[in-house]
Amino acid sequence: MTQQSNSADRKPRGKGPKRPRKPKVDPFSIGELEITDYKDVKMLRRFVSDTGKILPRRRTGLSAKHQRRIAQTIKVARQLALLPYTEKLVRK
């Protein structure tokens, strides 16, 4: 005896209720931060992932102009060995 799969029994996947997301605000536009110097490693680390990659705009919430400036600043800091190019990957 074979079982027939009834499509009415299945639940659609990924069709849950959508939560409204809080819009990301560019911290440079509101004056919270300023791209002043490549030597400010503490500020630059906010825009670098744990593995050392530059975070994309959708994660940082920066405008296109500020994303380009922060990327250039991070690259300068990497060349001067203030920031690492990659972090050591630790598998758990």
From Swiss-Prot:
Keyword set includes Isomerase: no
GO cellular component: cytosolic small ribosomal subunit
Lineage: Bacteria, Thermotogati, Deinococcota, Deinococci, Deinococcales
The family this protein is said to belong to: Belongs to the bacterial ribosomal protein bS18 family.
Protein name as catalogued: Small ribosomal subunit protein bS18
SUPFAM superfamilies per UniProt: Ribosomal protein S18
Any matching Pfam family: Ribosomal_S18
InterPro entries in UniProt: Ribosomal_bS18, Ribosomal_bS18_sf
Bias (Basic residues) ranges: 12-22
Function: Binds as a heterodimer with protein bS6 to the central domain of the 16S rRNA, where it helps stabilize the platform of the 30S subunit.
Organism of origin: Deinococcus deserti (strain DSM 17065 / CIP 109153 / LMG 22923 / VCD115)
Subunit relationships: Part of the 30S ribosomal subunit. Forms a tight heterodimer with protein bS6.
Keywords for the protein's UniProt record, in alphabetical order: Ribonucleoprotein, Ribosomal protein, RNA-binding, rRNA-binding
Region Disordered: start-end pairs: 1-27
Matching Gene3D superfamilies: Ribosomal protein S18 (4.10.640.10)
Gene that this polypeptide is encoded by: rpsR
Single GO molecular function: structural constituent of ribosome
One example of a Gene Ontology biological process annotation: translation
NCBIfam families with a match to the protein in the record: S18
